[in-house]
Regions:
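Intrinsic-disorder-associated, low-complexity terminal segments enriched in Asp/Asn/His/Tyr and depleted
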Residues: 163-164
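Charge-dense, helix-prone N-terminal extensions
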Residues: 1-158
Length: 165
């Protein structure tokens, strides 16, 4: 199986222009600008376009052993799709299923939450879900960096005891 390249990458496109042209109702535009503020304030990251239709905040590098896909992806994000707003905030980590029970009215995708309008969900619960996802991803990132450092020591020194430290 060959390595496949991810198609959704960070771009320099204008987030505001995207929302103004892509959000198909006034309510969706209003909710999108509100989500933009919530996620930017919460994460401290500037919003960036990912591919033609995802607004992302922060990023992490991933490598899938299953699909052999590797690339960068936003820590959290959203997209004002035609049918609903897709929230890319769910990682399935411990405790998130309980938080979903408190979220409000939504539909669940494989790894995202679909909401018709922002007023349908509890924004404080949304922030808790965002926090748990970011914490989960940053823990994985830190663990992988530690493993890489240990592997570098093993390769450089050629001693098993160095690798196990």
């Amino acid at each position: 199986m060959s390595k496949t390249e991810i198609k959704t990458k960070q771009t320099n496109a204008s987030v505001e222009d995207f929302i103004n042209t892509f959000a198909n109702t006034e309510q969706k535009r209003k909710d999108s600008f509100e989500l933009l503020k919530i996620m930017q304030d919460f994460t401290g990251f500037e919003p960036k376009m990912w591919g033609p239709s995802i607004i992302g905040f922060g990023q992490y590098h991933y490598k899938s052993e299953k699909s052999l896909q590797e690339g960068d992806w936003p820590l959290i994000g959203f997209s004002p799709r035609k049918a609903a707003i897709s929230l890319y905030v769910y990682s399935g980590c411990s405790g998130q299923e309980d938080l979903l029970k408190e979220l409000g009215k939504f539909k669940m995708g494989k790894s995202c939450v679909y909401v018709n309008k922002l007023s349908d969900i509890n924004q404080e619960t949304l922030k808790k879900i965002m926090k748990s996802t970011i914490d989960f991803l940053q823990t994985i990132i830190a663990r992988k960096k530690t493993e890489q450092i240990k592997m570098i020591k093993f390769v450089c020194y050629g001693k098993k005891e160095e690798y196990n430290q």
